[in-house]
Amino acid sequence: MARVDFWHTASIPRLNIPALRMSDGPNGVRGTRFFNGIPAACFPCATALGATWDAHLLHEVGQLMGDESIAKGSHIVLGPTINIQRSPLGGRGFESFAEDGVLSGILAGNYCKGLQEKGVAATLKHFVCNDQEHERLAVSSIVTMRALREIYLLPFQLAMRICPTACVMTAYNKVNGTHVSENKELITDILRKEWNWDGLVMSDWFGTYTTSDAINAGLDLEMPGKTRWRGSALAHAVSSNKVAEFVLDDRVRNILNLVNWVEPLGIPEHAPEKALNRPQDRDLLRRAAAESVVLMKNEDNILPLRKDKPILVIGPNAQIAAYCGGGSASLDPYYTVSPFEGVTAKATSEVQFSQGVYSHKELPLLGPLLKTQDGKPGFTFRVYNEPPSHKDRTLVDELHLLRSSGFLMDYINPKIHSFTFFVDMEGYFTPTESGVYDFGVTVVGTGRLLIDNETVVDNTKNQRQGTAFFGNATVEERGSKHLNAGQTYKVVLEFGSAPTSDLDTRGIVVFGPGGFRFGAARQVSQEELISNAVSQASQASQVIIFAGLTSEWETEGNDREHMDLPPGTDEMISRVLDANPDNTVVCLQSGTPVTMPWVHKAKALVHAWFGGNECGNGIADVLFGDVNPSAKLPVTFPVRLQDNPSYLNFRSERGRVLYGEDVYVGYRYYEKTNVKPLYPFGHGLSYTTFSRSDLKITTSPEKSTLTDGEPITATVQVKNTGTVAGAEIVQLWVLPPKTEVNRPVRELKGFTKVFLQPGEEKQVEIVVEKKLATSWWDEQRGKWASEKGTYGVSVTGTGEEELSGEFGVERTRYWVGL
């Protein structure tokens, strides 16, 4: 009923009950190690997959996720995440598919179906209202039952209809005053009884807060091990009748059922972790990346670009691969492709680069620029039980690393005596340019950076709390030193593990023995960078700006403070557009919405999210027209932060956050209040054009009770009226009649994707159950209400064309269940 470590349940050899392995998660199967782990496939982030609106693609993604899980020896994947982006600022917003429960639930259900067809258990998370990072362990989400049902529980409900998952993970937070991991109404009454689901409920890591209340509420498994709340505490609760034995039996039975469920995989205990990286997997990752790219704007059809004309690439996201967000979603990918690499690989003419601006939150990692004493790329990582001041220290471990950032939460070495240990990281740096270099150190623990035995950064005393490493780390402390081009310098980071820190860790879950990050960059004038980019752009025949966010800016453990791009980025984009407005394409990468004060100047804009291993190739495929963009926004992009419905209620205030927008989340709010967004939910252009015609709505006869089996079927003719093959996403919206309660103007109820050659026409069919298409949650009755009346139907897609129809509901009926 609790784990033995971070990733395994306890085995009972005498009963032939094996341990089970679990692994994150949202956009790739990391395996059992955050630190120095086996590389894995990195999928586009969830908002990117949400932008595909492609249930079949998500099924394929789930199947590959299953193969990756088996390769890592993992029985259970801790994903997908299907929380709702009630604010653009949520640190984990990129982990969820959409702001709408129907889009999110259908995609998640197909993802889980593909995963579980491989025999691997899927885990829907985080159940429920885990929609912010601020005080996430303690905050109480104050939400009406109507909003809880119609918005936040809906994606879980719809996903379960498609694929009852083997597992569900509870959220960290409270809902209306009670932590979800001990909330009987949510776990037992709704999830198990009303939805008739019989899988395993686990807590999020350190998201169990009681013994008896959690057991009695229905929490089967405390995560992670070793237990804090079970073991002897649970034995005492049983002996004192705080927990009945039959309740304990139910919790154990669910764990054993999961053991039996995954048993056909045949994964042995302590299975070795392997890398796949197969050609067909790379093809799928590239296709997913390309199909997620949203064409936001394309005046004068300046896209697609010409491969045979010179190209100037500008921007901070060009030569790095922003492949994923931060936190649980992060992993070590098999490889990455930057946008610059993707463009260069396709172009047949010259491709130049100008930095334009830097956008790092912390200094770029120094590790890739270092060499070991014997000339290998990277640095040595030497572990000791004693601090550097101790004479004749004994070396207990030595590793060779490339990445100068590591979260040691799962680092184990039997020669280490305790959580308190010390590491010397040593490498040699030969700069290519002379100048003053800034160096930065961020630690969970302590760190001192020395260059040729001179202390440049001291992060060992008077430490300041930062946000890195799930909020465990210090801020990045910096120092500077002048370096000469061509001269080699010895760089050493003296690191002490987490217990050596003087940070106040009360209220913070400290994951393991610590973490480190060290980086460096040559000081350079921002004005100089922008001016150089503007000068080059003014003479260029084709310009692509790559800008946006990275895992530093969007990460678990920390919400964003604003929607703006990193400092200097907007100025750079604006000035480049002024210099060459007719030939400049702006490509942004972020997992959630950003402000664009310069957008009126741009003729072409694409949004490319965090695109996984193949992000650069996927972007280039769209920019050059090898893939016709078909993606649609899964979240609304407001003009400014103040326009979003959660603006007044997004953070914990005295331990609670009020979901004051009620059911008016995302597009529901903008349409109800006539607040025009920058780009609406469902927006996305194509290189071709489509027509939609001949909408027909058919319904089945009504029964006395409203159950499954009363489908509403919409058929429509879709034709590719352009000259380029492409895919159209057909969206079905339902407009409710006037009722006794306020309802959204319209709500998405179904969608489908169809690929058409130029001139080709197909009939498209979307089927929705009447109860799902018409109902709202009646708090007085505690039931869904499908009210009598005439319901409007709207069918939309690429462009402004909208088809309208209607259907009737003859009598008001109420229902509960899945």
From Swiss-Prot:
Its EC number is 3.2.1.21. It is an enzyme of class 3 (hydrolase). Signal peptide: none annotated. Keywords: Carbohydrate metabolism, Cellulose degradation, Glycoprotein, Glycosidase, Hydrolase, Polysaccharide degradation, Secreted. Glycans are attached at N176, N453, N472. Gene3D superfamilies: Galactose-binding domain-like, Glycoside hydrolase family 3 C-terminal domain, Glycoside hydrolase, family 3, N-terminal domain, Immunoglobulins. GO terms for biological process: cellulose catabolic process. It is found in: Secreted. Pfam families: Fn3-like, Glyco_hydro_3, Glyco_hydro_3_C, PA14. Residues 374-534 form the PA14 domain. Pathway: Glycan metabolism; cellulose degradation. PANTHER family: BETA-GLUCOSIDASE, BETA-GLUCOSIDASE-RELATED. Beta-glucosidases are one of a number of cellulolytic enzymes involved in the degradation of cellulosic biomass. Catalyzes the last step releasing glucose from the inhibitory cellobiose. Belongs to the glycosyl hydrolase 3 family. This is Probable beta-glucosidase I. It comes from Aspergillus niger (strain ATCC MYA-4892 / CBS 513.88 / FGSC A1513). The gene is bglI.
